């Protein structure tokens, strides 16, 4: 009986945590989705962004009390501009998706929305974490040894 309870708790924690990618696994996945060089942005920059925004966690969320928005998923895409969570006042939903779609282990929708974000004039500078931790820095460490 104790084994079943422990197993249940372990499975529940995995479900709540979502998928946390290994660094090279994510690098290969993002490359397969066409992010390497997309809009002139290197794969290493995308990896740096994902590291600092979510620590490679698909279920990461962050509430922003100022505008009552929430950042979602591996790229921490914001509900004020890019997705619909049904709670953010004045939301634009430029990616035309539910914010919950950004929390899936399958990051297809998250990648598609990230591509939409960088098509705007700000490009990758839309992400504060990228500006703080990746811009004008050697980001090669994020793909080093991954064979991508």
Curated annotation (Swiss-Prot):
Complex and partners: Monomer.
GO terms of biological process kind: defense response to Gram-negative bacterium; defense response to Gram-positive bacterium; killing of cells of another organism
Residue numbers annotated as active site: 53, 71
Disulfide bonds: 24-146, 48-134, 83-99, 95-113
Family assignment from sequence similarity: Belongs to the glycosyl hydrolase 22 family.
Keyword terms: Antimicrobial, Bacteriolytic enzyme, Disulfide bond, Glycosidase, Hydrolase, Signal
Catalytic activity reported: Hydrolysis of (1->4)-beta-linkages between N-acetylmuramic acid and N-acetyl-D-glucosamine residues in a peptidoglycan and between N-acetyl-D-glucosamine residues in chitodextrins
EC number per UniProt: 3.2.1.17
GO molecular function: lysozyme activity
SMART domains: LYZ1
Known role: Lysozymes have primarily a bacteriolytic function; those in tissues and body fluids are associated with the monocyte-macrophage system and enhance the activity of immunoagents.
Extra remark: Lysozyme C is capable of both hydrolysis and transglycosylation; it also shows a slight esterase activity. It acts rapidly on both peptide-substituted and unsubstituted peptidoglycan, and slowly on chitin oligosaccharides.
Signal peptide: 1-18
Enzymatic class: hydrolase
InterPro entries assigned: Glyco_hydro_22, Glyco_hydro_22_CS, Glyco_hydro_22_lys, Lysozyme-like_dom_sf
Cell division among keywords: no
Protein name: Lysozyme C
Domain C-type lysozyme residues, every copy: 19-148
